[in-house]
């Protein structure tokens, strides 16, 4: 996948911060986010950029993730504190702000909420959340259904993914 010239600096950064799988995944999320933004009337460039950087802290050690979160004066909720899998999104949003000096709160929010979602998500937050679910590298059992729904209705796709995640959490105990 070719990265547009204006994002080459960030592409190079990702190559130093992510393993090969996560790097390819990030390119796929960026591509899917751009497509969904075009489909649903959001800014395709912001969607691509947020998708590209959504996992920037994914391969960082938990201590490094926590350090970035603390540096940004972010207070973790009790459930966030207990679940390390959530830290990369929070740390990623902090990294965008503190290290990359990104000031667009829509992009920062899309990175912050791409793992859990939240009530009253912005269009860009929904797009990056879904793009993470449907990127080309994803192979989970319902991925084709989510891809199909994401082409028809962003709200239906969001509802389906939330239900899917809840049922998976319940099944996994």
What are these regions (language model features)?
Residues 20-22:
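A short, charge-rich alpha-helical start-of-domain segment used by transcription regulators
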Residues 1-4:
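Non-catalytic interface/linker regions that flank or bridge core catalytic/transmembrane domains
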Residues 9-16, 36-162:
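Divalent metal-dependent catalytic cores for phosphoryl transfer on phosphate-bearing substrates
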Residues 168-173:
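Charged phosphate-binding loop/patch that engages nucleotide di/tri-phosphates or the phosphate backbone
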Residues 25:
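N-terminal glycine-rich anion-binding loops that anchor highly charged ligand groups
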């Amino acid at each position: 996948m070719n990265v547009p010239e204006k994002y080459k600096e960030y592409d190079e950064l990702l190559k130093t911060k992510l393993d090969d799988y996560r790097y390819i995944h990030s390119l796929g999320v960026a591509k899917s986010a751009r497509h969904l933004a075009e489909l649903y009337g959001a800014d395709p460039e912001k969607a691509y950029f947020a998708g590209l950087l959504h996992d920037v802290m994914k391969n960082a050690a938990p201590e490094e993730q926590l350090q970035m979160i603390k540096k940004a004066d972010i207070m973790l909720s009790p459930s966030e504190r207990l679940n390390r899998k959530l830290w990369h999104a929070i740390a990623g949003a902090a990294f965008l702000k503190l290290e990359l000096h990104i000031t667009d709160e829509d992009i920062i929010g899309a990175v912050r909420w791409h793992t859990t979602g939240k009530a009253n998500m912005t269009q860009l937050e929904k797009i990056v959340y879904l793009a993470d679910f449907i990127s080309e590298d994803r192979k989970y059992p319902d991925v084709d259904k989510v891809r199909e729904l994401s082409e028809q209705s962003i709200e239906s796709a969001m509802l389906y993914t939330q239900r899917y995640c809840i049922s998976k959490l319940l099944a996994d105990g």
